[in-house]
């Protein structure tokens, strides 16, 4: 790999703004804000709006809607049902 052309990849802490859930991961994103992690080291803190802790798909709070079929829509529209 060529030197000097790749972004700096380092550990950062992501925090869910809605739930406060935090996790440590690697990223090229930087931040002036830092936080002390469980291992005693300080890492840049990145605040995000949605993580797996608050997204409805991962939390099981997602609502599934049954879509009507084309024939059912036609019958409903013209009162044939």
From Swiss-Prot:
Please verify whether the record's keywords include NADP.
Answer: no
Q: What Gene3D superfamilies has UniProt attached to this entry?
A: Ribosomal protein L31
State which residue ranges cross the membrane.
Answer: none
What SUPFAM superfamilies does the record point to? L28p-like (SSF143800)
* Keyword list, A-Z: Ribonucleoprotein, Ribosomal protein
InterPro entries tied to this protein: Ribosomal_bL28/bL31-like_sf, Ribosomal_bL31, Ribosomal_bL31_B, Ribosomal_bL31_sf
List, in alphabetical order, the Gene Ontology terms for molecular function in this entry.
structural constituent of ribosome
What biological process terms from GO does the record include? translation
Q: Per the record, what is one GO cellular component? A: ribosome
Which Pfam families does the UniProt entry name for this protein? Ribosomal_L31 (PF01197)
Q: Which family, according to the similarity comment? A: Belongs to the bacterial ribosomal protein bL31 family. Type B subfamily.
Q: How does it assemble?
A: Part of the 50S ribosomal subunit.
What's the protein name? Large ribosomal subunit protein bL31B
* Taxonomic lineage of the native organism: Bacteria, Bacillati, Bacillota, Bacilli, Lactobacillales
Q: Which gene encodes it?
A: rpmE2
């Amino acid at each position: 790999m060529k030197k000097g052309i790749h972004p700096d990849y380092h550990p950062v802490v992501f925090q869910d703004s809605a739930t406060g859930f935090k996790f440590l991961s690697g990223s090229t994103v930087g931040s002036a804000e830092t936080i002390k992690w469980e291992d005693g080291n300080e890492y840049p803190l990145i605040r995000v709006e949605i993580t797996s802790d608050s997204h409805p798909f991962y939390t099981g709070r997602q609502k599934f809607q049954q879509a009507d079929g084309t024939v059912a829509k036609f019958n409903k529209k013209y009162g044939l049902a």
